[in-house]
């Protein structure tokens, strides 16, 4: 069926024992480079966190992808977002972001600096979805022991973040999202 004929919905998983968890993790692992992936123990630990949403994106009965985000009182931070490769280019990603925006809070995500064709295209995709790049120098903390943090561009919708909003996001990223990401 074509995208748009059915209602898009997010179905939340709260445990690694969910029957679709392994298929979801296979998509997750194949969609991001190692340095942008959580370690499995870390991923399993956060599944039940009240702010964390490990959501499967569905269009009717079609499982289109994953949107993994943190929701606070004042913003939503999309940590990971991916669509199954065979379904890319069919507006699932755009419609999933539109659905997230319906919550009426600023939506924040990070992208690689636009230096090659893929990263330039990705930035263009988010801009077409209403996101704007922010001017803040931003380093995402490392997901793995022995790795450096990585420089990323912070994008937000519906508008740029104020310094205060960026500060609140950066603090939440350090103290909640990235807390205990690898075992000491």
Write out the residue ranges for each language-model feature.
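Conserved GNAT acetyl-CoA-binding A-motif
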Residues: 103-118
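Conserved catalytic-core motifs of GNAT/GCN5-like acyltransferases
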Residues: 34, 110, 123, 127-147
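Conserved acetyl-CoA-binding loop-helix of GNAT-fold acetyltransferases
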Residues: 83, 89-102
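Conserved beta-strand in the GNAT
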Residues: 56, 61-70, 74-82
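Short amphipathic alpha-helix that is part of the acyltransferase structural core
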Residues: 4-41, 152, 164-184
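Active-site rim helix/loop that mediates acceptor-substrate recognition in acyltransferases
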Residues: 30-60
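Short hydrophobic/aromatic beta-strand or adjacent loop that forms the aromatic wall/cage
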Residues: 52, 149-154
